[in-house]
A protein has these predicted regions:
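C-terminal helical subdomain
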Residues: 3-7, 194-197, 201-202, 217-254
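Residue(s) in the substrate-gating loop at a strand-loop-helix junction
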Residues: 158
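Active-site helix of classical SDR
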Residues: 138, 174-177, 185
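Substrate-binding pocket helix/loop in short-chain dehydrogenase/reductase
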Residues: 114-115, 122-127
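Conserved glycine-rich cofactor-binding loop
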Residues: 25, 32-33
Length: 254
């Protein structure tokens, strides 16, 4: 009969690496509700000092208050991300708080209209917030992160912007804006490599948000904002360089 193998006890204590997010300064746009609010809350719970940006001042202050009540650190900065001057003011305030470590671009609008009746105003607002706003914030974050040689960026697109996925009528402007976000993220990853800046894009399917309920009340969401926020935190807390430039589709969690 074989003798049992004796267990060797190590006198060296097991050491776990500290969370990357702990004590980092993180900026979340679209932080007044939905994915943005859930992400800001989750980042604060992970130890980050979170700057929350959105147009709705009252809702933004509500999310900020709940984060602080839970013991987190949060700074609200009302901002229209489609306005270049407003984004410049936002990043000036961020710079006053410290070195920016992470950016999550969750600001977005969703307006449904038949293609033949899509007005120029709807087209410009949708691309202005979803694509131009993401560009302006990523450009400013890139400039802030590059001198430090480190930075992590997460953008939010949609399955509607992913090639060969199911598309829905009335979302021409939205779909185009999300295709653009995916391409923008790839470009940031290419140029960010030499500066230690990584960028990934998440493309969730239907998420249970107020925005989606208004646009398509009949659609049954398979994801919650918390589902997306948890993945964002996990990504930011991990080395992003190996997957920088990737677009990660998120399907139903049901």
């Amino acid at each position: 009969m074989d003798e049992p193998v004796p267990r060797v006890r190590s006198e060296t204590p097991q050491v776990f690496p500290a969370r990357w997010l702990a004590e980092r300064l993180a900026l979340v746009t679209g932080a007044s509700r939905g994915i943005g609010a859930a992400t800001a809350t989750a980042l604060a719970a992970a130890g980050a000092h979170v700057v929350l940006a959105a147009r709705d001042r009252q809702a933004l202050e509500g999310v900020t208050g709940r984060i602080k009540d839970a013991g987190g650190r949060a700074t609200p900065v009302p901002t229209d991300v489609s306005d270049e001057a407003a984004v410049e003011r936002l990043f000036a305030e961020v710079a006053g708080l410290g070195q920016l470590g992470a950016l999550v671009c969750a600001a977005g609008v969703l307006t449904s209209a038949p293609f033949g009746k899509t007005t120029l105003a709807v087209w410009q607002e949708t691309l202005g917030v979803n694509l131009t706003g993401t560009f302006l914030c990523c450009r400013a974050a890139f400039a802030a992160m590059a001198p430090a040689g480190e930075g992590r960026i997460v953008t939010i697109a949609s399955l509607s912007g992913v090639y060969a996925t199911e598309k829905f009528p009335g979302l021409a402007a939205y779909n185009v804006s999300k295709y653009g976000v995916i391409g923008l993220t790839e470009a940031i990853a290419v140029e960010g490599k030499e500066h230690g800046i990584s960028a990934v894009c998440l493309s969730p399917g239907a998420v249970d948000t107020e925005m989606l309920r208004r646009a398509n009340p009949a659609l049954r969401p398979g994801l919650t904002p918390d589902d997306v926020a948890e993945l964002i935190v996990a990504l930011l807390d991990s080395p992003l360089a190996p997957v920088s430039g990737a677009n990660i589709p998120l399907f139903s969690n049901a």
